[in-house]
Amino acid sequence: MAEHNDLGKFGEDLSVEFLQKKGYSILETNWTFQKAEIDIIAQKENILVIVEVKTRSSIDFGSPQDFVKPAKIQLLVKAVNEYVISNDLDLEIRFDIIAVYKERKEFKIEHFEDAFYHF
């Protein structure tokens, strides 16, 4: 596995642990539909939380959350629609970004709730 894939997996694992500690139930990880992949699908109370994880070894070239582009958002929305229909869910949906980045010798996590709107 390429080093950047290892880093991405590390960031996703940290994010799952982070969310669980905050009381989220993890429903799926790396859920795919067509060309879209949702990193984490979680639930907290009556909210379905769709989480895009962005991991960077440094923030020299920009914050991780800045790398979630409109095309990615469109793919996520299509995938979420399919997930909700397939699982017959009636929940509020929220899109979050978790940024994982290295600062000095340790990794930091930032959680951006309601990071973007799909309507």
From Swiss-Prot:
Domain of life the protein comes from: Bacteria
GO molecular function, a single term: nucleic acid binding
InterPro entries: Restrct_endonuc-II-like (IPR011335), tRNA_endonuc-like_dom_sf (IPR011856), UPF0102_YraN-like (IPR003509)
Family note: Belongs to the UPF0102 family.
Xref: PANTHER family: UPF0102 PROTEIN YRAN (PTHR34039:SF1)
Protein name in UniProt: UPF0102 protein FP2501
Species of the source: Flavobacterium psychrophilum (strain ATCC 49511 / DSM 21280 / CIP 103535 / JIP02/86)
